[in-house]
Design a protein with these regions (language model features):
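Nucleic acid-binding interface residues in structured DNA/RNA-binding domains
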Residues: 9-16, 65-164
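Low-complexity, small/basic-enriched stretches
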Residues: 1-67, 132-165, 172-173
Length: 173
């Protein structure tokens, strides 16, 4: 899993699938990390971080909640395009790596790599990008806890296609 231990987090938020480490500048979210089991939640250290946490908690209660916090997404031009395309996928829907690649005139593997490099998962919904015949990957893994988190997020949004509900194989993001 993409776990980080020694980051300077502005908050550590308890969520149904673990603890999220929230990184932000004064006025933009720069990262969300899935923290290792046993990590303790920590209150937000700024008003902006409190807003980020409140919006995440609101989304976790109501999948139709909208995020309005500014994001600072740093990456290659291709990754930027993929992340923007993911932000355009409506809640309750998914796109395959191939479909997104076709829209962006790219290839499925490059889309999967951009999904895996997404610095702000949950808000930038890489979980909505799935394999052609399965869930695909999540956090650079194709099985285990990361796929359980992806499955949880998709089920929460009522987006998980029933053939994929128990599926854990795939590639990419």
């Amino acid at each position: 899993m993409r776990y980080h231990r020694r980051m300077d987090y502005q908050a550590k938020l308890k969520v149904p699938f673990g603890v999220l480490g929230i990184r932000c500048t004064g006025d933009a979210v720069t990262g969300i990390d899935f923290l290792p089991a046993g990590e303790k939640p920590r209150r937000a250290t700024s008003a902006f971080a409190e807003t980020v946490c409140a919006q995440l908690l609101h989304y976790l209660e109501n999948p139709d909640a909208q995020f309005s916090v500014p994001l600072e997404l740093n990456g290659t031009p291709h990754r930027q395009k993929v992340w923007q395309a993911m932000l355009a996928i409506p809640r309750g829907q998914t796109r395959s790596y191939g479909e997104l690649a076709s829209e962006l005139k790219s290839c499925a593997q490059a889309v999967g790599q951009a999904c895996g490099a997404n610095p702000i998962p949950v808000i930038v919904p890489c979980h909505r990008v799935v394999g052609k015949a399965g869930l695909g990957g999540f956090m650079k893994h194709a099985s285990g806890d990361p796929l359980d988190i992806k499955r949880w997020l998709l089920a929460h949004e009522h987006a998980i296609p029933s053939p994929l509900a128990g599926e854990g194989q795939g590639r990419g993001g």
